[in-house]
């Protein structure tokens, strides 16, 4: 009976650990998609506020808006290298760090050259997330929820675009001073980014990447947990 009781306790511990891992995988999948959408949709209802602060004009505003896509293309192209050499987990941490740090720097309203560099970096992070998050999910998420996680990532992109559009309009109407409104707009992204950045440290590494690196014991340990 004692042995049976111990077995039940071990089973409960394993079940609890499994639920925690699944929770964090779901959270990062959601945040990765959300941040993708937040940064993609940010410019739509913030450009007018940005122009009031930086006096960009139509052409300058268009150039600033396009920088994100440029960074995104380069980030996506280099994501395979990051995934291979850094691993999936550390690549996610890198993306979270870029999202959070560059959003915070942007909120300080730096010179336009620095702001543009931050937007390029945010695009770079979007490119990394767009490649790494689905890859990580395909290799790590439990088979029972793997398909749902891919759908969740796509859904959260759309939600992020909608959310930032509504949020920026509300912020601009509440805070009429653009020098106050614009930092708050950037800090909204920073808040979600910090959750992703910190949460990524708690994720298990991809078992496939561990196997590719010859770390078979660690890979089996991760597979046993998920």
Region locations from a protein language model:
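Transmembrane-helix signature of 12-pass secondary carriers
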Residues: 2-225
